[in-house]
């Protein structure tokens, strides 16, 4: 029994499922999760000190790689002055100004402690601003574990939502409408039916929780038009895509301006940070200046602000996103070529520093949740464990996006592709 197996056995006696977030349990791939004790650059090291090339990056935050010196220095320096005050600090202002500089649509913003808090608060704000109850989300898009968002489609696109988890009252979930991602016609149909009842659309501009599925041409533009037509709020959930698809997020990459934006992951540089913001007139509805309540003991925590500010400052220097995009393309296309050499049918998607691959015979681009669910999950499980044995750590679920960092050099990507070629040959 290795150290991870020992720790997992111990953890299950005190922590539900042995983990503090379900996907970490390896239920999607089987086997024992790797317990990590340290990380550096593009590598993580398990409890037995085995090294892995890391394409999870703490599920997205580590865009500069692990243990970046600028972030560590900022955290250590700030921590010497105190860990938390529960009062305003200057660094909160500096951080907010930096975010607005990079994401101009966020004219005003509020810091929180997680992406879930950000999306939950943005939806409450949209409801308060519009005076409407219903929200529209997309099948396969994840926006955190707030009750209103753990909802899947009922029987048909135009039916009311039903809960996707025990503990969510159906009477509450009925206010969440769900339609197919990348299908603007369904959006128009449901708005025609519910018209002035819908407070907002919330969308991952690049869907990252059904693997990696970019928007089809015209989809985001269509959402903007529908929201304008019906005076609903367009919320871009950029918790995953923010500062990763482009320096200004997916909204900069696709040149679409939402009314509200939610951020997380990269904005914290590895610390627990989220944010939501947008049009000044909407943000003026949030307490203490407006009637919509939102609060948080650790919101704007100085250590987290320091880490996030250092991360964004470093990320904005040079042409890092051009390098990230090139590296991601090299990896994704290299995986596809390696699969083809070994007679394995593989579809790949990538945008910015996000990538995904699907074991499928479908020759069409993967653009929908339905297509993603029809891919070969069993083959992914085998490939995942083969790659793990080769020292490559992929997301332990076929529905999760992969992430690159500036620490993923050409040599590291080439090493990954050599391992992949070997693993595809064994499928």
From Swiss-Prot:
E.C. no: 5.4.3.8
A GO CC annotation given for this chain: cytoplasm
InterPro entries hit by this protein: 4pyrrol_synth_GluAld_NH2Trfase (IPR004639), Aminotrans_3 (IPR005814), Aminotrans_3_PPA_site (IPR049704), PyrdxlP-dep_Trfase (IPR015424), PyrdxlP-dep_Trfase_major (IPR015421), PyrdxlP-dep_Trfase_small (IPR015422)
Protein's cellular compartments: Cytoplasm
Keyword check for Isomerase: yes
Family matches, as Pfam families: Aminotran_3
Annotated pathway: Porphyrin-containing compound metabolism; protoporphyrin-IX biosynthesis; 5-aminolevulinate from L-glutamyl-tRNA(Glu): step 2/2
Catalytic activity: (S)-4-amino-5-oxopentanoate = 5-aminolevulinate
Protein name: Glutamate-1-semialdehyde 2,1-aminomutase
Source organism of the structure: Colwellia psychrerythraea (strain 34H / ATCC BAA-681)
Gene expressing this chain: hemL
